[in-house]
């Protein structure tokens, strides 16, 4: 049975005060939660502070991006070795904001995936279609292409112990969200697509939903059989809202 994971992507938000206050509040809100793994991805500059603030809790550290290089003359980048050294575990790659604003290709994201696996870190591979692609009926085609960038170069075994986050681009930060049935259909397609290469691997892959997940829609999303948690944006910056989402995932998967 898959163990749900709810991860907060803080994006470009934070301060020393905010990190300490938010994590302190999360610790209170999430006390006693054992049926759902919880991770947070603050900006890199606050990773060490967040690590100490979360020390002794069940909150696991993550990061929002990684470079393909481990060291060298690559100004402004953060390597997988550095993230591992500081204690990060779940590393987001392929987020639509990186694909759009930084022109990251499927091939580059696949390289990041490989580097993370080599370092023993867990990739959180974001995939998803734009509004235009959705309206053109290309959702499955786009998701398959983004998965195949890894599948065809690294094999199905590369997805062992990995997290995939399906984030329809049209739902990120817009207030729109896929209906539970829509999200489930895509999640099932993703799992079935990997299963064509290896059914056993596909069954254990955690597939999160992302895209305007909030306290109001989380519970219904998590009742779907192939939705294994969420990658949460704005709601992860509020301890009470984030805790509702985590508890909804725990309750749904224990039902």
Swiss-Prot record:
Single GO BP term: glyceraldehyde-3-phosphate biosynthetic process
Catalytic reaction(s) noted: D-glyceraldehyde 3-phosphate = dihydroxyacetone phosphate
Pathway where this protein functions: Carbohydrate biosynthesis; gluconeogenesis; Carbohydrate degradation; glycolysis; D-glyceraldehyde 3-phosphate from glycerone phosphate: step 1/1
Keywords: Cytoplasm, Gluconeogenesis, Glycolysis, Isomerase
GO MF assignments: triose-phosphate isomerase activity
Residues annotated as catalytic: 95 (electrophile), 167 (proton acceptor)
GO annotations of cellular component type: cytosol
Enzyme Commission code: 5.3.1.1
Coarse class of the protein's main subcellular location: cytoplasm
Binding-site residues, substrate: 9-11, 173, 212, 233-234
Localisation: Cytoplasm
InterPro entries to which the protein is assigned, alphabetical: Aldolase_TIM (IPR013785), TIM_sf (IPR035990), TrioseP_Isoase_bac/euk (IPR022896), Triosephosphate_isomerase (IPR000652), Triosephosphate_isomerase_AS (IPR020861)
Entry superkingdom: Bacteria
Role description: Involved in the gluconeogenesis. Catalyzes stereospecifically the conversion of dihydroxyacetone phosphate (DHAP) to D-glyceraldehyde-3-phosphate (G3P).
Record HAMAP family: TIM_B
Family: Belongs to the triosephosphate isomerase family.
UniProt subunit comment: Homodimer.
Name used for this protein in its record: Triosephosphate isomerase
Gene name of the record: tpiA
């Amino acid at each position: 049975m898959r163990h749900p994971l709810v991860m907060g992507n803080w994006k470009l938000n934070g301060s020393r005060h905010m990190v300490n206050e938010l994590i302190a509040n999360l610790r209170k809100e999430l006390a006693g939660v054992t049926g759902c793994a919880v991770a947070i991805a603050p900006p890199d500059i606050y990773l060490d502070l967040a690590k100490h603030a979360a020390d002794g809790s069940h909150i696991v550290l993550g990061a929002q991006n990684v470079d393909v290089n481990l060291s060298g003359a690559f100004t402004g980048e953060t390597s997988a070795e550095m993230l591992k050294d500081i204690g990060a575990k779940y590393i987001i790659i392929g987020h639509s904001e990186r694909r759009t604003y930084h022109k990251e290709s499927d091939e580059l994201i696949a390289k990041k995936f490989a580097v993370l696996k080599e370092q023993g870190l867990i990739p959180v591979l974001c995939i998803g279609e734009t509004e235009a692609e959705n309206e053109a009926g290309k959702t499955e085609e786009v998701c398959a292409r983004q998965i195949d960038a890894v599948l065809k170069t690294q094999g199905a075994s590369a997805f062992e112990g990995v997290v995939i986050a399906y984030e329809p681009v049209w739902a990120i930060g817009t207030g729109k969200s896929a209906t539970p049935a829509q999200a489930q259909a895509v999640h099932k397609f993703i799992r079935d697509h990997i299963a064509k290469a290896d059914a056993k691997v596909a069954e254990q892959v955690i597939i999160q939903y992302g895209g305007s997940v909030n306290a109001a829609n989380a519970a219904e999303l998590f009742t779907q059989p192939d939705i294994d948690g969420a990658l949460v944006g704005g709601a992860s910056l509020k301890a009470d809202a984030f805790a509702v989402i985590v508890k909804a995932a725990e309750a749904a998967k224990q039902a």
